UniProtKB/Swiss-Prot annotation:
InterPro entries reported for this sequence: DapD_Trfase_Hexpep_rpt_fam, Hexapep, Hexapep_transf_CS, THP_succinylTrfase_dom1, THP_succinylTrfase_N_sf, Trimer_LpxA-like_sf
Entry's Gene Ontology cellular component terms: cytoplasm
Pathways per UniProt: Amino-acid biosynthesis; L-lysine biosynthesis via DAP pathway; LL-2,6-diaminopimelate from (S)-tetrahydrodipicolinate (succinylase route): step 1/3
Enzyme Commission number(s) from the entry: 2.3.1.117
Enzyme class, UniProt record, top EC level: transferase
Name the UniProt record assigns to this protein: 2,3,4,5-tetrahydropyridine-2,6-dicarboxylate N-succinyltransferase
Similarity comment text for this entry: Belongs to the transferase hexapeptide repeat family.
Gene Ontology process terms (BP): diaminopimelate biosynthetic process; lysine biosynthetic process via diaminopimelate
Main location: cytoplasm
Reaction(s) the record says it catalyses: (S)-2,3,4,5-tetrahydrodipicolinate + succinyl-CoA + H2O = (S)-2-succinylamino-6-oxoheptanedioate + CoA
Subcellular locations according to the entry: Cytoplasm
Length: 274
């Protein structure tokens, strides 16, 4: 694996000079191998090691290089034709392969090659970009989007119209991460490498970026870029110091543990916030 990484790192340093016409065989094969490994889930752009999320920047570099080495090509779809550098993940799937991999794909859901979809996942008409990782038992609901290199955990529900941000550039940025057993409410947006920790419930229409204040009403603490595990979060506002205006924030209205969450429905958690 180190040799593969070295090839990618070296090629990335001269990426401005690489085109589909002049790319050397070693680089092309290395990039294609990485995309294949991302596609199968053997590699992932970010993973949790000793309780901390670690981003493998060289894998993001390989994804960016794939845009340098490939020309646009005609892509056939169920309703139309497309013209792009990245093939669709399911272009060569037959019924036997869908059965083997064990997920459902509802038309016109679109998944780019280089994204991993685990077993028992359901993709409603939605979009999953290259480098993303969608773990077991997750529902990606209608018109939800999973951005490039985003990491979605097990048993997550991304409700209708949810946007999970992609983050190939700037290269040093970390991917957006939704940990296991989270619920993201309809039309919410989680972007810019924000981490929603395990078992959290995000209400409808909550917007989370790195600069968003995430206010815990019980403790008065303000978080940035991270929703603590087991949080129930709704949209809110915080007043300015002079009291003349207020600015948008997200509010942690309560914390729940796995036992409580298992007994109480999502709707009840969100309705009883007083």
């Amino acid at each position: 694996m180190q040799q593969l990484q070295n090839v990618i790192e070296t090629a990335f340093e001269r990426r401005a000079d690489i085109t589909p016409v002049n790319v050397d065989t070693v680089t092309r094969e290395a990039v294609n191998q990485v995309i294949s490994l991302l596609d199968s889930g053997a590699l992932r752009v970010a993973e949790k090691i000793d309780g901390q999320w670690v981003t493998h920047q060289w894998l993001k570099k390989a994804v960016l290089l794939s845009f340098r080495i490939n020309d646009n090509q005609v892509i056939d779809g169920a309703e139309s034709r497309y013209f792009d550098k990245v093939p669709m993940k399911f272009a060569d799937y037959d019924e036997a392969r869908f059965q083997k991999e064990g997920f459902r794909v509802v038309p016109p859901a679109a998944v780019r090659q280089g994204a991993f979809i685990a077993r028992n996942t359901v993709l409603m008409p939605s979009y999953v970009n290259i480098g993303a990782y969608v773990d077991e038992g997750t529902m990606v609901d209608t018109w939800a989007t999973v951005g490039s290199c985003a990491q979605i955990g097990k048993n997550v529900h991304l409700s209708g119209g949810v946007g999970i941000g992609g983050v190939l550039e700037p290269l040093q940025a970390n991917p957006t991460i939704i940990e296991d057993n989270c619920f993201i409410g309809a039309r919410s947006e989680v972007v810019e490498g924000v981490i929603v920790e395990e078992g959290s419930v995000i209400s409808m229409g909550v917007y989370l970026g790195q600069s968003t204040k995430i206010y815990d009403r019980e403790t008065g603490e303000v978080h940035y870029g991270r929703v603590p595990a087991g949080s129930v979060v709704v949209s809110g506002n915080l007043p300015s110091k002079d009291g003349k205006y207020s600015l948008y924030c997200a509010v942690i209205v309560k914390k729940v543990d796995a036992k409580t969450r298992g007994k109480v429905g999502i709707n009840e958690l969100l309705r009883t916030i007083d």
